[in-house]
């Protein structure tokens, strides 16, 4: 009896649409056998929608359960099997599949009940009996572990509750043990059931840092991926109490509370899903209400007096992660709309606060940037003009209120808020800047005697210069003011910001060599001053950041790039600043590096279009002579020598909302430029570039992920993957590489991904299974038909290595496909490398699946000519592959051996067998020995 595959019910003529439903079932069964479980699932779903009898529905539901089991979506597998059981309580296959799903979900007690029913229905079924024994053993092991865990938890609780313990050392040790114990599900459950949450609440109330950290980390274990325990924990501690811990002065405690709140949010948001632990918990009536309470508490924390700046930043970080949709495919953005209505003004209040100013909220140097990122993500999450208009209206009302009704202090806050918007949702910032009197106030305050007012105004002017239209206006009206500030101010903080404003205006033409805002040589002077300030250790990091901002703009000019990479001290200062606590510098550093490596997108203009544009007297961008490939390669080598990879690796590790997806994209572009030359890849790997590329390839913008994946492919092609990505890290490389196989990627990216996957597939079976699990095989097969010979060859080589896996061999052995035919035909192509790959795959498949040997003569009438051509090839590798295929075919069937011996193959093998000792000679001799064994030929008198 088979319990894992799909079944086909008999169609009933009386059922409307029975023939089409039956066709869909058959299609689903074939797709299931071929390993296309998603396709099979779709076919079964369509068959269900046509309307069927309860018996047929039960079979289709259990077929869907089989698909979900293969796809490792165990919650859905359980649901489908349960539907089948509802329609037929004695459906033993559905019961068995549900038991498999329940086992994977950790619900062993329920899985045992289903298996016992299976055994009672079919007592002689050995599969059921063996499964029941296995689960019984798992339950006994869990009971033993729980017994030992009980004793550990009890002992630690006694120490923590003992009033006689005067010192805290024992208590701290016990609390740390609780943290370790809570990482295991059994331990977390025991702590929870032993009134552990109440005890941990008492530890939080001690306000001792070590005990608070231990309590928070233990709570992480209790709440992690467990919705019911999370809700129970919140009911004991109170959501507002947990959120309030974010605001403490101690940075470590605030970060621990931030981690706990992230875990709580994940548990509430996702609920019971695939792979979650402890599904026997309580049912939650309305998790959405708990989510809103949590988010509302975070919004209130933003504007509470007495909250630390670090706590405010952590609250913003959580809101950035929690609120916006993860994917635009998700149609529900109601949480974003609710946050905008309830908390937009609170976010703007943080963004408009001045650091270290009297009467202002306590903020850090990173607070405004974090607020900008949150505002940007909220704005990007809006779906229609009406929602965006509401966002604009709320921002404008807030700014207008401060600008018009609170005197000079109100104007400063309004302008600071505009700067925050310009750094985030710039459309909203530009609209706010156009409000009556705002731009005039910015210009006027630039001439103020007070440093605080000048700082706010100059920064707003810098951010306003981002748009070409506004840059032209400021060039005409504000350059003289910025120059006066740069030359006349006695404060470095003002001078450096004025310099950045000039840099930004000077780079308004971008990489266009023909468009220069300032006179020749002016940008070089500005860049020199930026480098001077950057290298000055006496200036604080927050001020030096502006020097990097200036260089980020000026490095559009190739002359500036050349001077910058020659200045070793400036490069080292840049890399040192990127490692500092001044996180807001990351984007500027990334921008400068992208400019120096020319890793932005650039397409060579069509010469005909250029001529047409000149004829029409339209402006045609010109490339700087020093942006040619030879100059770019030289700059890349200088950056590598200066240690750019180590600096970028540290930037990737940054756990801050400032490391936005756009910033990740910049780093991905630079990494791709660094690994362009083969001789540079060893340096990148040695300095940790391979490790840094993995998170960039898995998270970020689509462009950034693709660039990082391509860089990973280049490293995998030319370096030993096991050394480049040691340990478990090598398995994380597969998914980014498979993503490069999509049709949206370029031909070069497809080719490099195929070559990299070929290398990985040749390492181990586990890696091959990972490639199969990522559904790469259908895409690789598609590229085997590609017209481009290099892509076709790479795909064939990849399939050759994958053919060592049983699942791929099953695909070739399945009836009704041309996979084997394609390999046979490719073995006779003119492209020698393609022939080598195809013949290698053919040799491997015929060795592992002898049944395929009898099908080779059936797939094409030219099979004999192709084999003879392989045997006669001057290439030893092709000869060896050909002789192995012939040997496998002869070993599989006497009839095929007879056909081969009746052809010229016999004469060719006789010649090959007499050659010098080699794999070809041995294989040819083995073929002749098999022919003698079959009595198809006679040995000569010498016994040869």
UniProtKB/Swiss-Prot annotation:
Q: Where are the TPR repeats?
A: 21-54, 58-91, 92-125
GO annotation, biological process:
cell differentiation; chaperone-mediated protein folding; muscle organ development
Where located? Cytoplasm; Cytoplasm, Perinuclear region; Nucleus
GO cellular component annotations of the record: cytosol; Golgi apparatus; nuclear speck; perinuclear region of cytoplasm
Q: Cite the SUPFAM superfamilies for this sequence.
A: ARM repeat, TPR-like
Region annotation (Disordered) maps to: 1-25
Tell me the GO molecular function terms.
Answer: Hsp90 protein binding
Q: Which domain of life is it from?
A: Eukaryota
Task: Report, as the record phrases it, the tissue specificity of this protein.
Answer: Detected in spleen, bone marrow, lung and ovary, and at lower levels in testis, kidney, heart and brain (at protein level). Ubiquitous. Detected in uterus, large intestine, kidney, spleen, lung, brain, liver and ovary.
Q: Which SMART domains match?
A: TPR (SM00028)
N6-acetyllysine: residues bearing it: 70, 483
What InterPro entries does the record tag this protein with?
ARM-like (IPR011989), ARM-type_fold (IPR016024), TPR-like_helical_dom_sf (IPR011990), TPR_rpt (IPR019734), UCS_central_dom (IPR024660)
Q: Spell out the subunit comment.
A: Interacts with PGR isoforms A and B as well as with NR3C1 in the absence of ligand, and with HSP90AB1. Binding to HSP90AB1 involves 2 UNC45A monomers per HSP90AB1 dimer.
Q: What does this protein do?
A: May act as co-chaperone for HSP90 (Potential). Prevents the stimulation of HSP90AB1 ATPase activity by AHSA1. Positive factor in promoting PGR function in the cell. May be necessary for proper folding of myosin (Potential). Necessary for normal cell proliferation. Necessary for normal myotube formation and myosin accumulation during muscle cell development. May play a role in erythropoiesis in stroma cells in the spleen.
The protein's name in its UniProt record: Protein unc-45 homolog A
Species assigned in the record: Mus musculus
């Amino acid at each position: 009896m088979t319990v894992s595959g799909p079944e086909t019910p008999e169609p009933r003529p009386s059922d409307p649409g029975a023939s089409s439903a039956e066709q869909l079932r058959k299609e689903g069964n074939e797709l299931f056998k071929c390993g296309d479980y998603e396709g099979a699932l779709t076919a079964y779903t369509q068959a269900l929608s046509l309307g069927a009898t309860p018996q047929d529905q039960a079979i289709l539901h259990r077929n869907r359960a089989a698909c979900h089991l293969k796809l490792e979506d165990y919650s859905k597998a359980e649901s489908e099997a349960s539907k089948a059981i509802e329609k037929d309580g004695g459906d033993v296959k559905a019961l068995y599949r549900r038991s498999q799903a329940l086992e994977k979900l950790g619900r062993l007690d329920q899985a045992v009940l289903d298996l016992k029913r299976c055994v009672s229905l079919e007592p002689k079924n050995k599969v059921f009996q063996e499964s029941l024994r296995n689960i019984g053993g798992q339950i006994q092991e869990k009971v033993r572990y729980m017994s030992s865990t009980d004793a550990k938890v009890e002992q630690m609780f006694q120490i923590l509750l003992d009033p006689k313990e005067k010192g805290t050392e024992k208590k701290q040790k016990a609390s740390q043990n609780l943290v370790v114990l809570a990482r295991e599900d059994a331990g977390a459950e025991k702590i929870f059931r032993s009134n552990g949450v109440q005890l941990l609440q008492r530890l939080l109330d001690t306000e001792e840092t070590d005990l608070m950290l231990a309590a928070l980390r233990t709570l992480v274990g209790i709440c992690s991926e467990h919705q019911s325990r999370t809700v129970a924990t919140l009911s004991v501690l109170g959501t507002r109490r947990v959120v309030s811990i974010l605001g403490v002065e101690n940075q470590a405690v605030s970060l621990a509370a931030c981690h706990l709140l992230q875990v709580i949010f994940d548990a509430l948001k996702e609920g019971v899903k695939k792979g979650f632990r402890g599904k026997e918990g309580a049912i939650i009536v309305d998790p959405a209400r708990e989510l809103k309470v949590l988010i509302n508490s975070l919004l209130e924390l933003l504007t509470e007096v007495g909250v630390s700046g670090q706590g405010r930043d952590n609250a913003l970080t959580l809101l950035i992660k929690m609120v916006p949709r993860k994917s635009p495919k998700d149609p529900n953005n109601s949480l974003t709309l609710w946050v905008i209505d309830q908390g937009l003004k609170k976010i703007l209040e943080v963004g408009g606060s001045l650091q270290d100013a009297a009467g202002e909220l306590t903020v850090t140097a990173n607070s405004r940037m974090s607020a900008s990122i949150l505002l940007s993500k909220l704005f990007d999450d809006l779906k229609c003009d009406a929602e965006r208009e509401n966002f604009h209206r709320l921002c404008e009302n807030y700014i207008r209120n401060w600008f018009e009704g609170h005197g000079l202090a109100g104007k400063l806050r309004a302008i600071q808020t505009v700067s925050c918007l310009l750094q985030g949702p710039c459309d909203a910032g530009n609209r706010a800047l156009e409000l009556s009197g705002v731009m005039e106030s910015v210009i006027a305050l630039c001439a103020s005697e007070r440093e605080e007012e000048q700082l706010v105004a100059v920064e707003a002017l810098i951010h306003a210069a981002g748009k070409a239209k506004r840059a032209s206006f400021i060039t005409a009206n504000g350059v003289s003011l910025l120059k006066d500030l740069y030359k006349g101010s006695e404060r470095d903080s003002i001078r450096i910001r004025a310099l950045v404003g000039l840099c930004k205006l000077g780079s308004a033409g971008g990489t266009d060599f023909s468009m220069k805002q300032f006179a020749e040589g002016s940008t070089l002077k500005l860049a020199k001053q930026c480098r001077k300030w950057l290298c000055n250790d006496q200036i604080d990091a927050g001020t030096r950041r502006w020097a990097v901002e200036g260089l980020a703009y000026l490095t559009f000019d190739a002359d500036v790039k050349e001077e910058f990479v020659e200045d070793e001290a400036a490069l080292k200062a840049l890399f040192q600043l990127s490692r500092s606590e001044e996180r807001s510098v990351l984007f500027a550093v990334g921008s400068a590096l992208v400019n120096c490596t020319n890793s932005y997108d650039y397409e060579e203009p069509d010469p005909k279009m250029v001529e047409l544009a000149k004829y029409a007297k339209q402006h045609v961008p010109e490339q700087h002579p020093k942006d040619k490939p030879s100059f770019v390669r030289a700059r890349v080598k200088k950056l590598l020598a200066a240690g750019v990879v180590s600096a970028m690796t540290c930037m990737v590790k940054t756990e801050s909302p400032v490391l936005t997806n756009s910033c990740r994209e910049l780093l991905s572009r630079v990494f791709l430029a660094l690994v362009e030359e083969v001789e540079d890849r060893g340096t990148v790997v040695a300095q940790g570039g391979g490790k840094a590329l993995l998170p960039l390839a898995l998270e970020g913008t689509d462009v950034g992920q693709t660039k990082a994946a391509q860089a990973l492919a280049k490293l995998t092609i030319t370096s030993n993957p096991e050394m480049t990505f040691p340990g478990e890290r090598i398995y994380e490389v597969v998914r980014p590489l498979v993503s490069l196989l999509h049709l949206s990627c370029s031909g070069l990216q497809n080719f490099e991904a195929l070559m990299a996957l070929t290398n990985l597939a040749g390492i181990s079976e586990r890696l091959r299974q990972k490639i199969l699990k990522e559904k790469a095989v259908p895409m690789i097969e598609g590229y085997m038909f590609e017209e481009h010979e290099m892509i076709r060859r790479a795909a064939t080589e990849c399939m050759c290595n994958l053919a060592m896996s049983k699942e791929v061999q099953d695909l070739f052995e399945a009836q009704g496909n041309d996979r084997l035919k394609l390999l046979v035909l490719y073995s006779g192509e003119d492209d020698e490398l393609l022939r080598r790959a195809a013949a290698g795959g053919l040799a491997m498949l015929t060795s592992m699946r002898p049944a395929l040997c009898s099908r080779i003569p059936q797939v094409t009438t030219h099979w004999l000519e192709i084999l003879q051509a392989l045997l006669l090839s001057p290439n030893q590798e092709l000869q060896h592959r050909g002789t192995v295929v012939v040997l496998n075919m002869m070993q599989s069937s006497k009839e095929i051996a007879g056909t081969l011996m009746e052809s010229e193959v016999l004469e060719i093998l006789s010649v090959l067998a007499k050659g010098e000792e080699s794999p070809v000679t041995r294989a040819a001799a083995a073929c002749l020995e098999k022919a003698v064994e079959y009595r198809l030929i006679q040995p000569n008198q010498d016994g040869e």
